[in-house]
Structure formats: structure tokens, C-alpha cells
From Swiss-Prot:
Role of this protein: NQR complex catalyzes the reduction of ubiquinone-1 to ubiquinol by two successive reactions, coupled with the transport of Na(+) ions from the cytoplasm to the periplasm. The first step is catalyzed by NqrF, which accepts electrons from NADH and reduces ubiquinone-1 to ubisemiquinone by a one-electron transfer pathway.
InterPro entries: 2Fe-2S_ferredoxin-like_sf, 2Fe-2S_ferredoxin-type, Beta-grasp_dom_sf, Cbr1-like_FAD-bd_dom, FAD-bd_FR_type, FNR_nucleotide-bd, NqrF, OxRdtase_FAD/NAD-bd
Binding-site residues, [2Fe-2S] cluster: C4, C7, C39
The protein, known as: Na(+)-translocating NADH-quinone reductase subunit F
Domain FAD-binding FR-type: 58-198
A GO term from the CC aspect: plasma membrane
NCBIfam families xrefs: nqrF
Description of how the protein assembles with itself and partners: Composed of six subunits; NqrA, NqrB, NqrC, NqrD, NqrE and NqrF.
Record key words, sorted: 2Fe-2S, Cell inner membrane, Cell membrane, FAD, Flavoprotein, Ion transport, Iron, Iron-sulfur, Membrane, Metal-binding, NAD, Sodium, Sodium transport, Translocase, Transport, Ubiquinone
Enzyme nomenclature, EC number: 7.2.1.1
Subcellular location: Cell inner membrane
């Protein structure tokens, strides 16, 4: 316990002194204000606590699958239809929890387009099955932004066993999500989250890779399409090869429409057919070497 720092509460009275396990997540100033990690507080008598207001706005919805398409070899874009007349009042950078029932799913039933099947066949991934005996819940960040109304959009990477340990069980929730087809029902709850942009004029630097695209897309679309922000911002995205890039037309359009926004992609394993002349390597290194190292005040940026 105490490792994720997500269960913050404000203790008004009771609970004893803050524990060393909490100090990685809570500053001395926050501790003086009563901030604690709920999982680390021993309840031995009556206490007075204050919970974040957004917790009381959490609801549950049964959604319908609009589409569930591959955007990369191991990433699907799941689009869910919110029930008519309902809204999920999330902020960019937020997440929902998705529920999956007990199931037995065969990877051989997955719909994987021909262009992405090479690696699936190479690593014999269609042999796997996901067997789950109880309901499960997992969290996923929204890829859409608040003004893409009526939907929830997720980028979900299938959690296959690693090549050096092929006998471990595959990811339970990602297997369920990859099995979903148009018209299927899916239950979500939310919204949750604290990964929100600050209301300042500081430069924004977004960095992500793979399915980490989701909150980056949500944030950037929200800044440029809803808020019409004039803040200087850049997006640095990492993918294995050109085939693993997605949403590039969207970001190209945003860059063309907004002179304050640029985006870059680095490929860690470009293929000969890619004819790639852009950045190569891991995106965090590319960001440092080609931008932050010579930036006049990287500490003033918001990441």
C-alpha cells in the first residue's frame, strides 16, 4: 500500500500522525493541511474527513459499442455510445472505469485486419485464451475530449504475454475489450482523474508513446478545439514503426490551424519500407536531445 498515491483524503480530526510511506506523495505543507493517503490511515476511533467533491459525481452507464477498430498492431480504438440524454462530465486527462464479466475469450476470435496480422502470426498470439471466473474492473483514460459529445473513446493495448515468458496469462480486461464488437453492451463508471491541465500561460510539453496517446489526444484537442488556447505547446510521440502511428492526420491538421502547436514523432524501430527520415530512438531521449537540452527554461514548462 501507499505506492500509487491515488487515495488522497483530507483528515480534519483523528487518524494519528502521517506515516513515512505517505511522504513520497504528500509534501510537508500538504501534511500540515491534513492531507493523507486513505490506505495508510489506521482507523481506531471516530474521524472527520473531507473527500474530493468529484467523487460524489461518479455514475454508472451501460454503453453500446459503436466501433472497435485497430489503430496499430496491438492497439484498438474502442468507441462507446453513451445512453441518449446522458453525459459523462469528464475533464480532459480524466479516466473511466470499465467493467468486464467473468469470461472465456479466445484470441482466435479477435478481428485483426490483415495489415496487422504479421506480428500476431510471428509470435503465435492467436493461441491465447483469457479465462476469468469473476467480474473485474480496470481504468482507462479517455482519448476523446469533452466536446466530442455522446461518446467515450479509449485506446486499448492488448496485454499479451511477453515473448520471454509466453506461458503467463494474458491481460484480463484488455482481452475482454478486444473481444467487443459493434452493438455489444459495456458498463462504465466515472468520471475520475487528477491529470488535468493547469490554467496558466506556461508552455505545455506533451510526451507519450503507444496507447499513452489517449490522454495526450484528449488534452491537446481540448486546448486547441475547445479552449482555443494560444499557449505554446508541442507533442512528442513515440512509436515502433510507421505502421504503429495513428491520428497523424488529426495532429497535422491541428498544427496547420494553430501556429502555437507543433508535433513530432520518433520511431524506435523504423522498417525499410517506411522510408523514414524523421526522428529515431526512444521519444524521451529525442525530446531531450532535440528540444529540452537547449531550452532556456525547461523547468517553467508544464509536462
Amino acid at each position: 500500500g501507499g505506492s500509487c498515491g491515488q487515495c488522497r483524503v483530507k483528515v480534519k480530526s483523528g487518524g494519528g500522525d502521517i506515516l513515512p510511506t505517505e511522504l513520497d506523495h504528500i509534501s510537508k505543507g500538504e501534511a500540515r493541511e491534513g492531507e493523507r493517503l486513505a490506505c495508510q490511515v489506521n482507523v481506531k476511533s471516530d474521524m472527520d474527513i473531507e473527500l474530493p467533491e468529484e467523487i460524489f459525481g461518479v455514475k454508472k452507464w451501460e454503453c453500446s459499442v459503436i466501433s472497435n477498430d485497430n489503430k496499430a498492431t496491438f492497439i484498438k480504438e474502442l468507441k462507446l455510445q453513451i445512453p441518449d440524454g446522458e453525459t459523462v462530465p469528464f475533464r480532459a486527462g480524466g479516466y473511466i472505469q470499465i467493467e468486464a464479466p467473468a469470461h472465456h475469450i479466445k484470441y482466435s476470435d479477435f478481428d485483426v485486419p490483415e495489415e496487422y496480422r504479421g506480428d500476431w502470426d510471428k509470435f503465435n498470439l492467436f493461441r491465447y485464451e483469457s479465462k476469468v471466473d469473476e467480474d473485474i474492473i480496470r481504468a482507462y483514460s479517455m482519448a476523446n475530449y469533452p466536446e466530442e459529445f455522446g461518446i467515450i473513446m479509449l485506446n486499448v493495448r492488448i496485454a499479451t504475454p511477453p515473448p520471454n515468458n509466453p506461458d503467463v496469462a494474458p491481460g484480463q480486461m484488455s482481452s475482454f475489450i478486444w473481444s467487443l464488437k459493434e452493438g455489444d453492451k459495456c458498463t462504465i463508471s466515472g468520471p475520475f482523474g487528477e491529470f488535468f491541465a493547469k490554467d496558466t500561460d506556461n508552455e505545455m510539453v506533451f510526451v507519450g508513446g503507444g496507447a499513452g496517446m489517449a490522454p495526450m489526444r484528449s488534452h491537446i484537442f481540448d486546448q486547441l478545439k475547445r479552449l482555443h488556447s494560444k499557449r505554446k505547446m508541442s507533442y512528442w510521440y513515440g512509436a515502433r514503426s510507421k505502421r504503429e502511428m495513428f491520428y497523424e492526420e488529426d495532429f497535422d491538421a491541428l498544427a496547420a490551424e494553430n501556429p502555437n502547436f507543433v508535433w513530432h514523432c520518433a520511431l524506435s524501430d523504423p522498417q525499410p519500407e517506411d522510408n523514414w527520415d524523421g526522428y529515431t530512438g526512444f521519444i524521451h531521449n529525442v525530446l531531450y536531445e532535440n528540444y529540452l537540452r537547449d531550452h532556456e527554461a525547461p523547468e517553467d514548462c508544464e509536462y
